[in-house]
Regions:
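Short, glycine-rich nucleotide/cofactor-binding loops
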Residues: 1-7
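Metal-dependent de-N-acetylase/amidase catalytic core
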Residues: 8, 15-16, 26-367
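A generic structural motif
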Residues: 20-24
């Protein structure tokens, strides 16, 4: 899901990005449109109309924009927005978002002129203004909302120079605009993941692994879809070298005894998390009640979790272990991330056990 990776293992990503031989790919399996409010889209589309009227979306004047040009240089929108971040220029950030929204509208609705773009944006605004908050949007509006979240994901990894070609948006079909979504299906939800494994040949796969019986939510269904793809991939080649990293973020935590690898978190890591989250996940900064434990942003909740986990480790090792450590990294550590490293067989076994538990819960609920 969008923002799960940074909220779970951003400091570990910081370490991996620094290795020049690593090739990183970030796959977001769900559209995430449910997390984008009508009010946010309305405001952003009004801003986009203002930029078009002021002649500030020059790409609309490209000779072949409406035929194919709109589909070129999606990464320019990311660079444009992040230039605004570096300059602390809100106007340019909003203009960068406007460029992306114009591309999105062009891809979904296929307008043939600037005038048709403007008319379509106005139609979407009217539709959303007449829609009761929380009701199910049309498939086109769901796609538009989802593509806004996809832009956010490209922004956060753009901080590292990761190109948009390495940020993959799978939009798996089980994720729908309903409270209870469908179970993953092989051809619809598992094969797209398997195709990515075949193409990129990863040696490490990371995902959220929430505890057993935590509920048939998005994390659980994504886990089952990934497990299905890994299982199919294991039939095609030897995966003994592949590692699966499980992590948790703002909803659940590992007990220290469950963790196989504990990642140190520095103040620099915390700054990167906070800044990139607030500047990238623009629809989520004001998310209501992200946690029952803390009334703040998701990134605040993640930071609080990592700091609390540091205190747990200090109870075992003592504060002096870090204060007087010869390692600059450990001396600078102010948080900890717990992760679980698994072989492919271990991961598949855990997924199957979790599936059996959930089937049992469903059967009890049907009694």
């Amino acid at each position: 899901h969008h923002d799960d990776i940074p909220l779970g293992i951003m400091p570990y990503i910081n370490f991996q990005v620094s290795k020049p031989n690593n090739e990183l790919h970030f796959s977001v399996l769900t559209s995430g449109f449910n997390a984008v409010t009508n009010a946010y889209v309305i405001k952003s589309l009004y801003n986009t109309l203002d930029f078009i009227t002021a002649g500030e979306v020059q790409m609309l004047q490209m000779e072949n924009y409406f035929e194919a040009g709109f589909n070129d240089w999606w990464g320019k929108d990311v660079s444009h927005f992040l230039d605004g971040v570096s300059e602390k220029n809100q106007y340019e950030k909003e203009r960068g978002l406007a460029h992306r929204l114009v591309r999105i509208v062009t891809e979904i609705y296929h307008p043939k002129s600037e005038e048709e773009v403007v008319e379509k944006i106005k139609e979407i605004i009217v539709d959303l203004e007449e829609t009761y908050p929380g009701s199910v949007n049309s498939p086109d509006v769901q796609k538009l909302k989802g593509m806004i979240r996809e832009f956010e994901e490209e922004l956060v990894w753009g901080h590292y120079g990761i190109p948009v070609s390495n940020v993959h948006h799978l939009r798996l079909g089980f994720y729908k605009g309903k409270i209870f979504t469908e179970q993953p299906e092989k051809n619809r939800d598992i094969v797209p993941i398997l195709d990515q494994f075949r193409q990129y040949q990863p040696t490490m796969i990371s995902l959220v692994m929430d505890p057993e019986g935590s509920g048939p939510d998005t994390h659980y269904k994504v886990l089952q879809a990934i497990a299905g793809a890994v299982k199919e991939w294991s039939k095609e080649k030897d995966l003994s070298h592949v590692k699966i990293m499980g992590y948790r973020n703002v909803w659940f935590r590992y007990h220290p005894a469950e963790a196989d690898i504990i990642v140190p978190v520095t103040l620099n890591d915390l700054h990167i998390l906070q800044n990139s989250f607030e500047e990238s996940y623009i629809t989520q900064v004001d998310a209501s009640f992200p946690s029952y434990e803390y009334d703040g942003t998701f990134s605040d909740v993640a930071q609080k979790t990592w700091v609390n986990q540091m205190r747990q480790i200090q109870l075992v090792l003592g504060k002096d272990y870090f204060i007087f450590n010869k390692s600059h990294l450990l001396k600078a550590t102010h948080g900890m991330i717990y992760t679980k490293m698994l072989t492919v067989n271990q991961f598949i076994e855990i997924a199957e056990q979790l599936e059996s538990i959930m089937e049992g819960i469903t059967e009890i609920g049907d009694l």
